[in-house]
């Protein structure tokens, strides 16, 4: 349960103000069809985070616990610093949408936008940290949906309620705490 809750919280916080959340807002404004967008986000996230979680689980079997502890601590610390740098989505409002429909467009755009993103890297690290692949992937996916579905449904009003700088600082603090815990707690 700890892996699920930590994964959900970390990713939900990390996603606020992230480029994929901005992408959700852009797709909602452009297509005005929330359900296909939300289902597209879900499918893309499950696929991306399942692969990321598998990579993290594999890494944890290839590296000794002592070395992995320091790698994870350094990675969590790097994520803490990275969380303090807000994402920006390139303005691509003049581009014509692909002809695949709203759902397929959302799946493709979200899957690609997640490549190398904070939440994907967090999923790899969390899967390496916890010996609970399904709980991590389910938690990170749930965190993505918690952050993105309301943006699709309620649009810009949601992002105005929370100052992004506060959310990013809280996320950075959580990653820093995870870095310390990775060093001092047994796996």
Residues of each region from the PLM?
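Juxtamembrane transmembrane-helix termini in multi-pass membrane transport proteins
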Residues: 2-63, 122-141
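Short hydrophobic "helix-edge" motifs at membrane interfaces and signal-peptide entry regions
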Residues: 7-9, 104-108, 153
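Hydrophobic/aromatic residues within the transmembrane alpha-helices of Major Facilitator Superfamily
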Residues: 8, 12, 16, 46-47, ...
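Membrane helix-loop-helix hairpins that form the core translocation module of multi-pass transporters
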Residues: 32-101, 150-173, 180
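Short, structured loop/turn "capping" segments at alpha-beta junctions
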Residues: 85-91, 118-122, 134-137
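Selected transmembrane alpha-helices and immediately adjacent juxtamembrane segments
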Residues: 94-120
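Hydrophobic alpha-helical transmembrane segments of multi-pass membrane transport proteins
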Residues: 142-151
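Juxtamembrane boundary at the C-terminal end of a transmembrane helix
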Residues: 180-187
């Amino acid at each position: 349960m700890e892996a699920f809750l930590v994964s959900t919280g970390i990713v939900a916080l990390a996603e606020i103000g992230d480029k994929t959340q901005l992408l959700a807002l852009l797709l909602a404004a452009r297509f005005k069809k929330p359900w296909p967008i939300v289902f597209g986000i879900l499918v893309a996230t499950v696929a991306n985070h399942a692969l990321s979680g598998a990579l993290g689980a594999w890494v944890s079997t290839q590296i000794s616990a002592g070395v992995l502890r320091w790698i994870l601590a350094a990675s969590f610390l790097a994520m803490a610093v990275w969380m303090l740098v807000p994402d920006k989505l390139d303005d691509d409002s003049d581009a014509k949408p692909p002809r695949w429909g709203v759902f397929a467009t959302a799946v493709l755009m979200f899957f690609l936008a997640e490549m190398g993103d904070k939440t994907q890297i967090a999923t790899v690290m969390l899967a390496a940290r916890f010996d609970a692949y399904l709980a991590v992937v389910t938690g990170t996916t749930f965190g993505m949906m918690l952050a993105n579905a309301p943006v699709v449904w309620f649009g810009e009003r949601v992002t105005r309620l929370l100052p992004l700088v506060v959310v990013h600082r809280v996320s950075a603090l959580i990653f820093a705490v995870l870095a310390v815990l990775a060093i001092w707690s047994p796996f």
